A protein has these predicted regions:
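Active-site core of metal-dependent hydrolases
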Residues: 177, 181-302
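Histidine-rich, glycine-flanked metal-binding segment
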Residues: 7, 20-74
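Conserved phosphate-binding/catalytic loop of the ribokinase/pfkB sugar-kinase fold
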Residues: 156-183
Length: 395
C-alpha cells in the first residue's frame, strides 16, 4: 500500500524523501526525536504499527531504513475536538468519519475524537452510530478513532455560538440515553454545568467513563469548581462561548486556569485567541494542563469559500470560518499548525508545546498508547523542520 503524505506547500522539498512504502518493520534514523519530554538524537524502530525500540539502534536484516534528515520527530498528534476535515463531517455518518480518519493521518494526526454538534435526537444517534462503526472496524491506514465527543445538546442558549438553538435541551440522563441508545463509543461530552440537572449528569457520566467538559455556558467560577467536584475535568475551547474572565468574577476561563483538576482545550489559530492569551494560558497551565484542539469544520485542509456546518452556511475568509452573522463557526486549523503557532506566535518553548498536542490530550481521555514515542505506542510519527513547518508523516 502506498503511504501518501499530506503537504500544504510548507515543505515541498521533503515530499520525495517521505513518500514511503508502508512497511511492517522500519527504522527511522537521523532525527531529533521527542522522547521523555526532551529532544534526543534517537532512532525509532517501528514494528507492526507500533514503536518497538527507541535509542541508538542498528538496522536489522531486511529492515527498511528511513532517514529523517535532521527533522524533529514527534509523536502523532491527538485531536480530542474535531467536527470535520477536508469536506468530510462526522455528523454525516460512517463514510465521512472514515474519510476523516484517512485524511487526518496525512496531517500527522495519530488519533482523534470526532465531535458532534447540536441536532435532533435521531440525527445525533445516527452520527454516533457512524462513529461507533469506525471504532469497531478501524481504517487499515488511518488515524485511530478514540470515540465520540458530544458537544451538545446540554448547552446554554445565550452562549450557543454556532450551535442550533432549537436542538438544545435540559441536561438529564434520560435525554442522554435517548440519543445514545446503548452505543459505547461516547468518550467525551461538553455541557453547561450551571444548568439544572447538569451536576447529576456529570457524576453519572463519570461512572460510565465519559469525560465531561464545560463550554457554551453561562457558568460562574463557583459553578465550574462545583462541576469539578462532581467529576468535570476539562474546559472546551477556553475563552470561547463562555462567560469572560473578570477580576471580580473570573468566570469559566478564570476557574479553568486556577483549578488544577481541569485541563483547558485551546484553539491556537490566532483567530479564536490572541497570541498573548495563548501565552498566558500556556504559561499558567503548563504542558500537562493544556490540550490543543482544532475544533475544525469541513473547510480544514481546503481553500477559502462557502461551506456547511449543521445546515448553516459558513463563509471562510483568510482561514476564519464564520456564519453570515459573523459568529465564529469552528476553525480550519490543523494540529501541526496549532503546534507551530504556540511556538512561533505565543512564544512557548517547544518542549512545553509538544505534549499539549500529543500526550496531554491523550491522557485527558485515557487513550493509552498515543501521544508518546515509547515502546508499545502507536507508530505514527509527525515530522517538522527547524521553523516548525510540517514536513510529513511516517506511519
Amino acid at each position: 500500500m502506498r503511504a501518501k503524505l499530506w503537504y500544504n506547500g510548507e515543505n515541498a522539498k521533503y515530499k520525495r524523501s517521505f513518500m514511503i512504502e508502508r512497511k511492517r518493520h522500519m527504522l527511522v534514523k537521523n532525527g531529533l526525536a521527542f522522547v521523555r519530554g526532551a529532544f534526543e538524537q534517537a532512532d525509532v524502530r517501528i514494528e507492526n504499527g507500533r514503536v518497538a525500540e527507541v535509542g541508538q539502534l542498528s538496522a536489522k536484516a531486511g529492515e527498511e531504513i528511513r532517514d529523517a534528515q535532521g527533522l524533529y520527530v514527534l509523536p502523532g498528534f491527538v485531536d480530542i475536538h474535531i467536527h470535520a476535515f477536508g469536506g468530510a463531517d462526522c455528523m454525516r455518518g460512517e463514510a465521512d468519519v472514515r474519510r476523516m480518519s484517512t485524511g487526518l493521518l496525512q496531517t500527522g494526526v495519530a488519533a482523534f475524537v470526532p465531535t458532534t454538534m447540536s441536532a435532533y435526537p435521531q440525527q445525533t444517534y445516527d452520527a454516533l452510530s457512524g462513529i461507533q462503526a469506525v471504532v469497531d472496524r478501524p481504517e487499515a491506514h488511518g488515524a485511530a478513532v478514540l470515540g465520540a465527543h458530544m458537544e451538545a445538546p446540554f448547552l446554554a442558549l445565550k452562549y450557543k455560538g454556532a450551535q442550533l438553538g432549537e436542538c438544545l435541551q435540559a441536561p438529564s440522563m434520560a435525554a442522554y440515553d435517548e440519543m445514545v441508545r446503548g452505543l459505547t463509543c461516547v468518550r467525551m461530552m461538553t455541557l453547561a454545568p450551571e444548568l439544572p440537572g447538569a451536576l447529576e449528569v456529570i457524576a453519572a457520566l463519570k461512572k460510565r467513563g465519559v469525560v465531561t467538559c464545560a463550554a457554551h455556558t453561562a457558568a460562574l467560577a463557583a459553578d465550574i469548581h462545583a462541576a469539578a467536584d462532581a467529576g468535570l475535568t476539562q474546559i472546551t475551547h477556553l475563552f470561547n462561548a463562555q462567560t469572560p474572565l473578570h477580576h471580580r468574577e473570573p468566570g469559566v476561563p478564570g476557574a479553568g486556569l486556577a483549578d488544577d483538576r481541569i485541563v483547558v482545550q485551546m484553539i491556537a489559530d490566532g483567530i479564536h485567541l490572541h497570541p498573548d492569551v495563548l501565552r498566558v494560558a500556556g504559561k499558567c497551565k503548563g504542558a500537562q494542563g493544556v490540550a490543543l484542539i482544532s475544533d475544525s469544520m469541513e473547510a480544514a485542509g481546503l481553500p477559502d469559500g462557502q461551506y456547511d456546518l449543521g445546515g448553516q452556511a459558513v463563509f471562510v475568509r483568510d482561514g476564519a470560518a464564520r456564519l453570515e452573522s459573523g459568529v465564529l463557526a469552528g476553525s480550519t486549523l490543523l494540529m501541526h499548525q496549532a503546534v507551530r503557532n504556540m511556538i512561533t506566535l505565543a512564544g512557548i518553548a517547544p518542549e512545553e508545546v509538544i505534549p499539549m498536542a500529543t500526550s496531554t490530550p491523550a491522557d485527558s481521555v485515557g487513550a493509552k498508547g498515543f501521544g508518546r514515542i515509547e515502546p508499545g505506542a502507536a507508530g505514527v510519527l509527525a515530522l517538522m523542520d527547524g521553523s516548525w513547518n510540517f514536513a510529513g508523516v511516517i506511519a
